[in-house]
């Protein structure tokens, strides 16, 4: 297939080094941080294609109009019905039951802007679906992107977030001033 070769060339042209391998688990919540630029999504898709990963993520259903819907679906997007009774967390947990192999990609900050807390959805989804969390990253300071460790949540949010914060502490976003603390709201 030619797409992984195109992705490799794009990474090279962008000056990026891809690190880490494929996850060793069949299902996981894959978080990508820090998220400070529109370019993050582009480079995440290039990395996904380069590595041959099937990563899915939610996109609000109003974005699924022709011809954008085809491009979104090809790249792993799942429409999120924001009007549906229940939460997006519930929809994500249900999605894990639909597939034998499933990686749900999320940006835990929930925005490209500075925020004081990460959204807790990734944590609640992983707990509810009983799957681990894979730590994905885009380190603009060192031009490295990839997948870090796989974390099995303990249920102790403080302990789990300390491990996650330790991993991301040396990673710099495209707009470092937009990076906030790595912690969940109470």
Which ranges hold each PLM region?
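Helix-enriched interaction subdomains in cytosolic or periplasmic regions
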Residues: 1-4
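Soluble catalytic domains of membrane acyltransferases
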Residues: 11-170, 175, 183-186
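Active-site-proximal loop/hinge segments within enzyme catalytic domains
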Residues: 178
């Amino acid at each position: 297939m030619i797409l992984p070769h195109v992705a490799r060339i794009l990474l090279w042209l962008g000056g990026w080094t891809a690190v880490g391998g494929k996850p060793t688990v069949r299902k996981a919540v894959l978080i990508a941080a820090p998220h400070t630029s529109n370019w993050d999504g582009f480079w995440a898709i290039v990395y996904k294609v380069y590595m041959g990963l099937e990563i899915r993520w939610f996109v609000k259903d109003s974005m699924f109009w022709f011809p954008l819907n085809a491009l979104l679906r090809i790249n792993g997007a799942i429409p999120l019905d924001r009007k549906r009774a229940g939460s997006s967390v519930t929809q994500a947990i249900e999605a894990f039951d639909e597939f034998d192999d499933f990686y749900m990609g999320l940006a835990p900050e929930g925005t490209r802007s500075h925020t004081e807390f990460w959204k807790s959805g990734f944590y609640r989804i992983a707990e509810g679906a009983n799957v681990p969390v894979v730590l994905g990253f885009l380190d603009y300071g060192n031009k490295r992107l990839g997948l870090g460790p796989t974390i099995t949540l303990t249920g102790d949010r403080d302990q789990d977030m300390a491990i996650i914060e330790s991993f991301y502490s040396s990673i710099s976003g495209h707009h470092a001033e937009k990076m906030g603390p790595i912690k969940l709201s109470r």
